[in-house]
């Protein structure tokens, strides 16, 4: 099992009058290679669930196991390492850094991973080529269409 979530809760302002239960007992299992759609009405907890699955947040209660690793008790630094090595997803707004070129936006995670400059150059251009953006590697997000920005984010 790649992702295994059991009885997951995310409660904001727990025990207070303003308490919000964003997730209330979610159980979910996803196998490697499986495609899953998270659907629901506005305010139903989709983004909260995705933030937890993407290791951007941790649950209030319940268990989250990602590729055999218990996520609940990890430090912020450990979660950042897991995000960098184990999981990724594309945000609706692409989250490209406006001041950086397509090349630099793709290169940035590789820098954080400690990939050598020689390997980075090859991997960045290969990735941009795979999504048809190798000819626009010098362009900043404002100089790209939404679809082009999405391909750079991928």
Which residues fall in each region the model found?
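ABC family nucleotide-binding domain
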Residues: 1-154
